[in-house]
Structures are given as structure tokens and as C-alpha cells.
From Swiss-Prot:
Gene (name only): rps12-A
Subunit and partners: Part of the 30S ribosomal subunit.
InterPro entries per UniProt: NA-bd_OB-fold, Ribosomal_uS12, Ribosomal_uS12_bac
Localisation per UniProt entry: Plastid, Chloroplast
This protein's name: Small ribosomal subunit protein uS12cz/uS12cy
GO molecular function annotations of the record: rRNA binding; structural constituent of ribosome
């Protein structure tokens, strides 16, 4: 515990909260253009080829975003919507591409959890 004299000399610093998605600049989503679409392998206990895209955002940042769901149509110059949310087994991937908006189509033949993959209700 500091003394009163120490607190007068040096006031307590407020705790600054650090954002987990700085490239969004406080916005819920951001638009961006894919500069590269590729696959990467996850961290140790897991094994797969995860689909990711390098995206240049309207905020000026160049980020790596995960493409969720089975199959996608994203390629270079695709315009996509990016939201926050990391992928635990991919280091450095702190964003998700929103499916079913702009150039990213929804997942084909998706029946459950459709809203997360941009799929309309089947007739």
C-alpha cells in the first residue's frame, strides 16, 4: 500500500483496456478486399487445412481473417465483411469473414445454425 504522500507525488494510473480487434477501430464490422486466399495448419494437437484470407480493410489495416463453413467462393479482389472473433488454434487470426454478405456467399446445403453462415430458410 502506498502512503498518502506517495499518492500525492504520483497519482494512480487508470487501467487502460486493450481491444482484441484493433483493426475494426471500434466498429462492429468492417468492409475489406481480399488480397490473398490460402490455407494454413492449426496449432499442435489439431490437424487440418484452415481456410483464411488476407484482407485490406477500409480502416487501412491488412489483417488475416478466417473463412468459416464448408466451401467458399472467396478469391483475390473479393469484397468481404469482417467481424471480430479469433480462431483459437490459428495464431494471429483474430477476425472472421461474415458469410452471406457482399461477395461471400452462404454455405451450401446448411440446415442448422444457418444464421451464422448466411443461409436463407429452405422452402
Amino acid at each position: 500500500m502506498p502512503t498518502i504522500k506517495q499518492l500525492i507525488r504520483n497519482a494512480r494510473q487508470p487501467i487502460r483496456n486493450v481491444t482484441k480487434s484493433p483493426a475494426l477501430r471500434g466498429c462492429p464490422q468492417r468492409r475489406g478486399t481480399c488480397t490473398r486466399v490460402y490455407t494454413i495448419t492449426p496449432k499442435k494437437p489439431n490437424s487440418a487445412l484452415r481456410k483464411v484470407a488476407r484482407v485490406r480493410l477500409t480502416s487501412g489495416f491488412e489483417i488475416t481473417a478466417y473463412i468459416p463453413g464448408i466451401g467458399h467462393n472467396s478469391q483475390e479482389h473479393s469484397v468481404v465483411l469482417v467481424r471480430g472473433g479469433r480462431v483459437k488454434d490459428l495464431p494471429g487470426v483474430r477476425y472472421h469473414i461474415v458469410r452471406g454478405t457482399l461477395d461471400a456467399v452462404g454455405v451450401k446445403d446448411r440446415q442448422q445454425g444457418r444464421s451464422k453462415y448466411g443461409v436463407k430458410k429452405p422452402k
